[in-house]
């Protein structure tokens, strides 16, 4: 009787952990892409001068 909610919450927290972990990875990928684009834009701007 008491184990059922425990298992449900364990599954819910596991899914929450993986969801937040995947979101953090996506944010890191976007952050690196933006940084790379800024570096490329700075290189292109320095070549034009």
From Swiss-Prot:
GO terms for biological process: cytochrome complex assembly. One of its GO terms (cellular component) is plasma membrane. Transmembrane segments: none annotated. It is found in: Cell inner membrane. Keywords: Cell inner membrane, Cell membrane, Cytochrome c-type biogenesis, Membrane, Transmembrane, Transport. It is a multi-pass membrane protein. Required for the export of heme to the periplasm for the biogenesis of c-type cytochromes. Belongs to the CcmC/CycZ/HelC family. This is Heme exporter protein C.
